[in-house]
């Protein structure tokens, strides 16, 4: 399996990638997919999972916490520590 996601996967939004991943999981869980097709859609599922992980990391990096002064007025932002 290649390390890089196929070009079409790299263009998907988080929501679209997650929707397709859920469809793949349902098909695999159903157990009615031939072996060769199962392997192919499993590999696509892995690429979709990597895409979702990448987009989540990007979103997390952009989330900021609003900082306030002593009176509670917003004065800026700083990275949100989600840990």
Curated annotation (Swiss-Prot):
<dbReference type="GO" id="GO:0009318">
    <property type="term" value="C:exodeoxyribonuclease VII complex"/>
</dbReference>
<keyword id="KW-0378">Hydrolase</keyword>
<keyword id="KW-0269">Exonuclease</keyword>
<keyword id="KW-0540">Nuclease</keyword>
<protein>
    <recommendedName>
        <fullName>Exodeoxyribonuclease 7 small subunit</fullName>
        <ecNumber>3.1.11.6</ecNumber>
    </recommendedName>
</protein>
<dbReference type="GO" id="GO:0005829">
    <property type="term" value="C:cytosol"/>
</dbReference>
<dbReference type="InterPro" id="IPR003761">
    <property type="entry name" value="Exonuc_VII_S"/>
</dbReference>
<comment type="subunit">
    <text>Heterooligomer composed of large and small subunits.</text>
</comment>
<dbReference type="GO" id="GO:0008855">
    <property type="term" value="F:exodeoxyribonuclease VII activity"/>
</dbReference>
<dbReference type="GO" id="GO:0006308">
    <property type="term" value="P:DNA catabolic process"/>
</dbReference>
<comment type="function">
    <text>Bidirectionally degrades single-stranded DNA into large acid-insoluble oligonucleotides, which are then degraded further into small acid-soluble oligonucleotides.</text>
</comment>
<dbReference type="InterPro" id="IPR037004">
    <property type="entry name" value="Exonuc_VII_ssu_sf"/>
</dbReference>
<keyword id="KW-0963">Cytoplasm</keyword>
<dbReference type="Pfam" id="PF02609">
    <property type="entry name" value="Exonuc_VII_S"/>
</dbReference>
<comment type="similarity">
    <text>Belongs to the XseB family.</text>
</comment>
């Amino acid at each position: 399996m290649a390390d890089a996601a196929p070009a079409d996967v790299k263009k998907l939004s988080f929501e679209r990638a997650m929707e397709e991943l859920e469809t793949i999981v349902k098909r695999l869980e159903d157990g009615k997919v031939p072996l060769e097709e199962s392997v192919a859609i499993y590999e696509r599922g892995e690429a979709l999972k990597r895409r979702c992980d990448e987009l989540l990391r990007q979103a997390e990096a952009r989330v900021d916490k609003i900082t306030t002064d002593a009176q509670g007025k917003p004065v800026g932002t700083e990275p949100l520590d989600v840990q």
